[in-house]
Design a protein with these regions (language model features):
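The AdoMet/dcAdoMet-binding core of the Class I SAM-like
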Residues: 1-64, 70, 74-80, 88, ...
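Short catalytic-loop micro-motif centered on adjacent basic/acidic residues
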Residues: 66-68, 95-96
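Soluble small-group transferase modules, centered on the S-adenosyl donor enzyme superfamily
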Residues: 93-193
């Protein structure tokens, strides 16, 4: 992981199920990164109020959970909405930022009242100008997330069904392209002729 992500040796990386790791640890962290969600492959045990509460318990007082959502759906009742509503039900502050050039959304969750001032101060302390510029861009795109009623729990986490909705949307989008090509150019357009 250190080689792949270019992390310095001072960063500790644990590669295992995040919930199991946290359950066995009393350690607290400044940042916990969760990167486990991709369209239809959503681990239910990393999607519930109970999981996000466990993450919250392992954050230092000014700590932040950063979640990478690699999802294409932003529809009402989507897996994105369920995950963000669930996070917002646990943390005092939840903000999102779209990632330029792809379908990812970064979600930042914290209980620190001064999170934005801390974020800006941290950017000001960066010595890598490119990284500082990128983080300023992220800050400009941050949008507060107001939680709703779509909450996932250990007892109710229909992530497979929600993932299938995403798959249906993906297939529908692909089929629309081919239907449009067939309507405008006929069969020869589809066959490249």
């Amino acid at each position: 992981a250190s080689d792949y992500f270019g992390l310095p040796d001072s960063v500790t990386v644990a590669v295992e199920d995040g919930r199991a790791y946290l359950a066995a640890s009393e350690e607290r962290f400044d940042v916990i990164m969760v990167d486990a969600y991709q369209d239809i492959t959503i681990p239910f045990q990393l999607s519930s109020v109970e999981f996000f509460t466990e993450v919250q318990r392992h954050l230092k007082p000014n700590g932040v959970m950063v979640v990478n959502l690699n999802m294409t759906s932003a529809e009402n009742g989507s897996i994105n909405e369920y995950l963000c509503d669930t996070m917002a039900s646990v943390f005092k502050y939840t903000v999102t930022a779209p990632v330029k050039g792809n379908t990812n959304t970064e979600v930042f969750c914290t209980d620190a009242d001064d999170w934005e001032e801390t974020f800006l101060r941290s950017i000001g302390n960066l010595t890598d100008c490119d990284y500082a510029d990128m983080m300023r861009t992220v800050h400009e795109k941050l949008t507060p997330y107001e939680g709703g009623a779509c909450i996932l729990t250990d007892d109710k986490a229909p992530v497979e069904v929600l993932g299938m909705r995403v798959l249906d949307e993906l297939i529908g989008d692909e089929l629309k392209y081919y239907k449009d090509e067939l309507k405008t150019g006929g069969l020869s357009a589809l066959l490249g002729g």
